A protein has these predicted regions:
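N-terminal basic/disordered segments at the start of proteins
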Residues: 2-32
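Short glycine-aspartate micro-motif
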Residues: 4-8, 137-141, 199
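Conserved Rossmann-like nucleotide-cofactor binding loop
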Residues: 12-14, 145, 207
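Helical "lid/coupling" subdomains associated with nucleotide-phosphate turnover
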Residues: 18, 47-78, 86-136, 151-301
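Conserved ATP-binding subdomain of kinase catalytic cores across diverse folds
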Residues: 27-43, 48, 64-67, 74
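Acidic, divalent-metal-coordinating active-site segment for phosphoryl/phosphodiester hydrolysis
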Residues: 144-151
Length: 301
């Protein structure tokens, strides 16, 4: 039995996930238990996609947060952890400098992972959790800074691409016409090349959209295009404050949920899909589960 953790520093939020792994547990549901999950609306992308760097204020906030994460890991007897930063830290001109400072003050080494590795981590976890071995699937993870699209064909990762087209970038008008064109071209080609493709959606926004649609449907793991269009048409005209009240959204979700819905609507159009599978798998899950697999493989050597 071991307690492991993952830290995911995204462009919109930062997450700490602690899980207990017990491969010898009799009941399957006891083999992996979530002990703690914390999400902080850090909003790194707000700085990076406008200033090009992490501001002093955000850096200070990040330091306090990482010190807190360290204490939570101590309290939960975490044996090992992996800490990763994605799109915003990749783009920040002072990203490496900030991470060195954090490591010096907290002892937590944060890795800046490339979009390709991000997609690979998510894909590995997806194969573990879903029956996606036959047919073609487009695994789409929409974050604050980037959107990862991975094509899985008959259980094999066929193609993967990271687009600088995240929700915070869209809100700040930082998505180029070239990126949008490439997204459309690639997804249209996938539809022609791989035929009937099913979309698997990932990220806090699609999870929330699916949850909002859930009360009116039987299938909790599938969000239809009609439901997504209906929710979008209801939310889009509202102000951020009105969305918070009408849909019980937090402030840091009420603004980004609109561009996220737009990305998924475009994906459905280009891939000719009528629904999105939402298995509720996050990058934080993928990181900690990947760490466990790695540790188990070492013990078997």
């Amino acid at each position: 039995m071991m307690n492991l953790a993952s830290i995911d520093i995204g462009s919109n939020g930062a997450r700490l996930l602690i899980k207990r792994f017990d491969p010898e547990a009799i009941r399957e549901e006891d083999r992996i238990k979530k002990l703690m999950f914390i999400r902080i609306p850090l909003r790194l992308g707000k700085d990076v996609f406008t200033l090009g760097k992490v501001s002093k204020e955000r850096e200070k906030m990040m330091l306090h947060m990482m010190k807190g994460f360290k204490q939570f890991m101590k309290l939960n007897d975490v044996e090992a952890f992996r800490a990763c930063a994605t799109s915003a830290m990749r783009d920040a001109e002072n990203g490496k400098k900030v991470l060195k400072k954090i490591e010096k003050q907290t002892g937590i080494k944060l890795e800046i992972i490339k979009g390709q590795e991000e997609a690979q981590l998510l894909y590995n976890n997806l194969v573990e959790k879903t029956d996606s071995n036959e047919g073609s699937f487009a695994y789409i993870d929409v974050g604050g800074g980037s959107t990862e699209v991975s094509i899985i064909h008959d259980g094999v990762l066929a193609e993967s691409y990271s687009y600088n087209m995240g929700t915070l970038r869209m809100l700040n008008g930082k998505v180029t016409a070239e990126t949008e064109k490439l997204f459309k071209e690639n997804l249209t080609r996938y539809a022609e090349q791989y035929g009937d493709i099913k979309i698997i959606g990932s990220g806090g926004n699609i999870n929330k959209l699916n949850k909002l649609a859930r009360h009116s449907k039987q299938d909790s793991k599938n969000l239809t295009l009609a439901e997504l269009k209906r929710l979008y048409s209801m939310m889009q005209p509202l102000s951020i404050e009105e969305r918070e009240i009408s849909f019980s959204l937090k402030e840091d979700r009420a603004d980004v949920i609109i561009p996220a819905a737009e990305i998924f609507l475009k994906a459905c159009e280009y891939l000719k899909c009528e629904s999105i599978m939402v298995p509720n798998i996050s990058l934080a899950d993928s990181i900690v589960d990947g760490l466990y697999e790695k540790m188990m493989a070492k013990t078997e050597e």
